[in-house]
């Protein structure tokens, strides 16, 4: 009986050690993947097509004074697509990006936080009141906590990178 208990305890300790090692390896690999994704977002945020799109989008928003309207009014104006109506050139410009790098969803806003383009239907038309958007704008990036995406039963981590126009 003592021998069986000792063997069981040793097996349990070995299993726990293997699990800890796998968790460490997973954490290292996830960190590297997040760094790679952040690097892609940083490069994409400096891409000439992205800069031009956000420049023109901001110009259109400001010319029409959309950035001065209350958020609920903007949401009402753009409730169907939740995107600022923009010229057809925007999606074709962004197709020039080398790849979406495995991101299931990308959202591009102009400098006032109004959506210009989204690869999936966004929940709302204005992002400037969202903590993640403000954090990315002020700190230079934002990485959210892992969450379960119930639509595909996968864990997702949201990331944001501001587009800073050098002009």
Region annotations inferred by a language model:
Residues 2-79, 99-103, 142:
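Juxtamembrane extracytoplasmic/periplasmic/luminal helical "stalk" adjacent to the first N-terminal
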Residues 16, 20, 38, 87, ...:
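Short, structured helix-loop boundary elements
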Residues 78-85, 120-123:
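Second-shell loop/turn segments in exported
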Residues 9-12, 36, 57, 85, ...:
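Residue-level detector of solvent-exposed, low-hydrophobicity positions
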Residues 25, 36, 89-92, 128:
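Short, conserved clusters of charged catalytic residues that mark active-site
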Residues 91, 95-167:
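Extracytoplasmic/periplasmic ligand-binding sensor regions of membrane-associated signaling proteins
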């Amino acid at each position: 009986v003592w021998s069986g208990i000792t063997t069981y305890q040793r097996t349990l300790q070995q299993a726990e050690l293997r699990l800890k090692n796998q968790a460490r390896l997973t954490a290292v690999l996830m960190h590297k993947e997040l760094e790679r994704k952040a690097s892609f977002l940083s490069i994409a945020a400096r891409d000439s097509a992205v800069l031009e799109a956000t420049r023109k989008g901001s110009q259109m928003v400001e010319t029409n004074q959309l950035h001065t309207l209350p958020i609920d009014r903007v949401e009402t104006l753009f409730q169907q697509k939740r995107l600022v109506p923009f010229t057809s050139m925007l999606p074709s410009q962004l197709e020039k990006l080398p790849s979406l790098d495995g991101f299931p969803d990308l959202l591009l806003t102009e400098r006032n936080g109004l959506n210009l383009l989204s690869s999936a239907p966004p929940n709302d038309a204005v992002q400037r009141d969202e903590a993640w958007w403000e954090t990315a704008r002020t700190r230079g990036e934002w990485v959210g906590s892992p969450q379960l995406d119930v639509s595909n039963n996968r864990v997702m981590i949201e990331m944001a990178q501001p587009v800073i126009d050098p002009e």
